Amino acid sequence: MLKKNNKRKIFCSALVLGSFGFLAASFVSIIYVITKNKIQYQEQRYKNIIFNHIVPSNLHDNDIQRSCLILNNKLLGDKKNHYLWLAKKKQDITAVIFETIAPDGYSGIIKMVISLDIKNGKILGVRVLSHNETPGLGDKIDVNISNWITKFSGVKIFSLDERDLSLKKYGGNIDQFTGATITPLAVVNSIKRTIVLVKMLLSSKFSELTSCDNYE
């Protein structure tokens, strides 16, 4: 009889613990979904703000974030998949936005987006999405800190050996930062690699790339 009572107590305890575990797991899952959706919403909102700064409204009439493609090319800084977005006017592609990284920043990876006018081949804008560069030195790549990154707007790049689009220290026209050369050099080189890739893609079809919807 005593053994039966002990078994019953063990069973009840296990049942209670299992129920609490299930409820806890369910609660965590619900919080995860809510948090994930909120994060995704904030990311989309942030990208909309960025896109509005680097692609003029008169160049597109589509929802740029919905015209998303996946591209994998080492010129984008690594071997991972990157996003690119197409700006369209009356279904014609007018500009393209590339997600790219500078893997060789002073304090690690610098994540950026670069937009290019398809018609004239000029850079429309560049913005840094995230970085870990030194405050007061390398963080001048952030448009909220200085206007340095805006000086690439209107620039046209023809090759990776573009002399003018180099730091003044190396005979170019781009200002380096006082006490910080590695950061701006990493950004400049990343921009050149990305634009060269864009020009390569213009000779092919963007439709051959995978849609973000299909990828996800």
From Swiss-Prot:
Keywords: Cell inner membrane, Cell membrane, Electron transport, Flavoprotein, FMN, Membrane, Phosphoprotein, Translocase, Transmembrane, Transmembrane helix, Transport. It comes from the Bacteria. It is an enzyme of class 7 (translocase). GO terms for molecular function: electron transfer activity; FMN binding. One of its GO terms (biological process) is electron transport chain. It is a single-pass membrane protein. The keyword Translocase applies. It is found in: Cell inner membrane. InterPro entries: FMN-bd, Ion_transpt_RnfG/RsxG. GO terms for cellular component: plasma membrane. The chain crosses the membrane at residues 14-34. The modification FMN phosphoryl threonine is found at residue 181. Its cofactor is FMN. The keyword Disulfide bond does not apply. Its EC number is 7.-.-.-. Belongs to the RnfG family. PANTHER family: ION-TRANSLOCATING OXIDOREDUCTASE COMPLEX SUBUNIT G. The complex is composed of six subunits: RnfA, RnfB, RnfC, RnfD, RnfE and RnfG. Part of a membrane-bound complex that couples electron transfer with translocation of ions across the membrane. This is Ion-translocating oxidoreductase complex subunit G.
